[in-house]
């Protein structure tokens, strides 16, 4: 990653997992006091994020190791809640777009993938579209949450995309590093990333999204093996976020290929066809509460927490 001293990066974070069924809107104040980092910028954002297990922290590490000059015009993250207000969305996106407009060699974005604003169903796709209009040739690397709702606008706007491999999520910084490695190889001319993507009409409960269990274990295993062995540059599977009532809710996959997409398309179809074959496994059948309580009483060696999954306790 060394030797890119002349490069300037724009690094930013804009993350929200929007529950469209929630009656509570999400204003900019929610990002300021929300989960993770607040709506910060500049040195304050770098100070808060650097060295943390966040996608923004991972991207800052990538920029530092590359020896690049970089700015952080926006670092915003809020807990899952209702629609992001128009004012909040415009404030965050304007800060990022205005910084890109000043000129840069690459953009590194820590996004969620399931942001819904009052005026846009696809918050991330709209941001990427705005950036592309002013920087059509600048490579854009995006790190995404596993519960992304993938769209054409997102894929068309980005150069590289990677998603979390874990749920509960513990690999946020590493997801950014994976995208960052491909970005650096792109800037040095070693690779020429091209993406293919697709989805299947599966609206699955996030309670069956854990990659250590089937059916997600098989799908994630296929993607991870292809990336880790160099068959493709990056491969990600996204479970979608079922608490969002939007047209593009689905299980999806994005494959980042080098120069040609033939191998990636084969892998993509294999992953998605397998998901469809295993679709019954994405149904969640909860135990009756009485059974759960009785089972919990049997655990005497440690405390037991019975949580309402509607509060996103697994994230």
Language model features: what each stretch is:
Residues 64-68, 101-102, 133-136, 163-166, ...:
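Generic secondary-structure signature for well-ordered alpha-helical cores
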Residues 2-65:
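N-terminal amphipathic/basic leader segments beginning at the initiator methionine
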Residues 207-315:
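Hard-cation-handling environments
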Residues 4, 10, 14-17, 21, ...:
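Active-site histidine-anchored catalytic micro-motif
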Residues 2-6, 64-68, 72, 98-107, ...:
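Glycine-rich phosphate/diphosphate-binding loops that line cofactor/substrate pockets in enzymes
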Residues 176, 180-224:
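Conserved anion/nucleotide-ligand pocket segment
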Residues 39-41, 72-81, 110-112, 271-278:
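Gly-rich Lys/Arg/Thr-decorated short loops/hinges at beta-loop-alpha junctions or inter-strand turns
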Residues 60-97:
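Low-complexity, highly charged intrinsically disordered N-terminal segments
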């Amino acid at each position: 990653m060394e030797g890119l001293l002349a490069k300037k990066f724009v690094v930013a974070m804009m993350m929200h997992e929007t529950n469209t069924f929630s009656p509570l809107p999400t204003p900019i104040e929610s990002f300021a006091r929300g989960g993770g980092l607040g709506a910060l910028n500049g040195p304050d954002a770098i100070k808060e994020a650097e060295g943390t297990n966040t996608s923004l922290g991972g991207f800052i590490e990538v920029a530092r190791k590359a020896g690049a000059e970089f700015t952080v015009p926006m670092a915003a993250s809020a807990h899952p809640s209702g629609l992001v207000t128009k004012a909040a969305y415009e404030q965050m996106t304007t800060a990022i777009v205005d910084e890109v407009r000043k000129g840069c060699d690459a953009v590194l974005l820590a996004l969620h993938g399931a942001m819904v604003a009052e005026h846009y169903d696809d918050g991330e796709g709209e941001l990427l579209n705005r950036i592309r209009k002013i920087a059509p040739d600048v490579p854009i690397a995006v790190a995404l949450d596993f519960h992304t709702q993938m769209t054409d606008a997102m894929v068309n706007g980005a150069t590289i995309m990677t998603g979390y491999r874990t749920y509960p999520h513990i690999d946020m910084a590493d997801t950014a590093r994976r995208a960052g490695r491909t970005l650096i190889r792109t800037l040095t001319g070693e690779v020429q990333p091209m993406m293919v993507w697709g989805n299947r009409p599966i609206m699955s409960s996030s309670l069956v999204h854990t990659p250590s269990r089937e059916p997600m274990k098989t799908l994630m295993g296929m993607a991870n093996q292809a990336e880790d062995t160099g068959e493709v540059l990056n491969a990600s599977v996204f479970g979608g976020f079922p608490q969002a009532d939007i047209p593009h809710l689905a299980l999806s996959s994005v494959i980042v290929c080098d120069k040609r997409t033939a191998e990636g398309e084969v892998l993509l179809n294999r992953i998605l066809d397998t998901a469809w074959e295993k679709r019954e496994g994405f149904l969640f059948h909860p135990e009756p509460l009485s059974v759960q309580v009785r089972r919990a009483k049997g655990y005497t060696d440690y405390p037991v927490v019975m949580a309402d999954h509607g509060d996103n306790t697994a994230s």
